[in-house]
């Protein structure tokens, strides 16, 4: 994170992750001898965020930013830290390497979070993503990410001020548009 955020901001993120994971992320994360902070947080994003809407919003931001979004299978399945696997191997990264049974995969794929993330993946093929990207920070807690194509536009608006974040994805094709504001609506894409 060097250069992207300050050490103080990173320490705050690590502290919040520790709180949200009941202290487990601190145990699983390794602090290199040459630095005072871990180089990565060994915990799953769903465990760190502790909220399904926050997790899907983080994925929406990821999908709206330029580049090729990548989602690890545990994140797609909304997987929480596998503390049992970590306890067995003592390898910090193993908290994010759950071995899913076929029944667990079926359950995860049917979940609202996974269906919403799959909807975002389908949306990423929209023609507007071949256009121009821009973003605006509206307030300390609200932002818009937007793609504008020849005949289409996609806009992600979100607000982080509440205990649960709010978001809206507006899809405009020609003269028609629709807005999606929930996980279940994202699943319909």
Each predicted region: which residue ranges?
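Active-site and adjacent substrate-binding regions of carbohydrate-active enzymes
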Residues: 1-189
